[in-house]
A protein has these predicted regions:
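Extended, low-complexity cationic-aromatic segments
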Residues: 1-77
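C-terminal anion-handling pockets and recognition modules
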Residues: 4-8, 131-179
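A generic structural signal for alpha->beta connector loops
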Residues: 5, 89, 115-118
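Acidic beta-strand-to-loop metal/phosphate-binding motif
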Residues: 10, 89-95
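RNase H-like two-metal-ion nuclease catalytic core shared by retroviral integrases
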Residues: 94-96, 103, 119-141, 151-154
């Protein structure tokens, strides 16, 4: 049974590329050789994201720089602030990226304990992180079979979907449920 005094969050980083992915799609039978537009670039936008597993609430932060200890620390402080209103203990599930263990934010994490702690997944096991399913759904709903002339179009598409999930969502809750 879930502890009502603990909020469990799953967190991860993700990149969404401007170069769209093509999946199954319907093409009228009279078009024998359809032309599919795509932008010849590998530009991408990165996000830190966290899902509260009890209600499917999404917290996200667009990252303009690379993911590193400084940007992760900034996101942890953002997540701490977003989750502090509940008064519950916060446990954050995260992977073993090197910068998640950085000394830069180790002191801050020890000051926040036991109210805010990181729980690391086993090495090389991203499939155990519930938020990975949300990234897959986001790609399917926002990026598959679509043409984005600019990177800002990708940002707009992704963030419009994310904004629907910031107050909690039953679909996200069920998708990220741990059985």
């Amino acid at each position: 049974m879930a502890d009502p005094k603990v909020d469990l969050w799953a967190t991860d980083e993700v990149h969404f590329q401007q170069y769209g992915s093509r999946c199954l799609m319907w093409v009228p039978p009279e078009e024998t050789d359809p032309v599919l537009l795509h932008h010849p670039t590998r530009k991408s936008v990165g996000y830190f994201g966290a899902v509260r597993l009890r209600d499917g609430k999404l917290a996200f932060h667009r990252e303009s720089e690379r993911f590193n200890a400084v940007t992760f620390h900034t996101f942890l402080k953002y997540l701490r602030q977003a989750s502090s209103r509940s008064g519950r203990r916060v446990v954050v599930i995260t992977d073993n990226a090197r910068y998640h263990h950085a000394k830069l934010h180790a002191d801050w994490r020890s000051q926040q304990a036991p109210q805010f702690v990181l729980d690391f997944l086993p090495p090389y096991s991203p499939d155990l992180n519930p938020i990975e399913r949300l990234w897959k759904l986001t790609r399917r709903l926002c990026l598959h079979n679509r043409y984005f002339p600019t990177l800002e179009d990708v940002v707009e598409s992704v963030e419009s979907k994310f904004s629907e999930w910031t107050s909690g969502n039953e679909v996200v809750r069920k998708l990220c449920a741990i059985n």
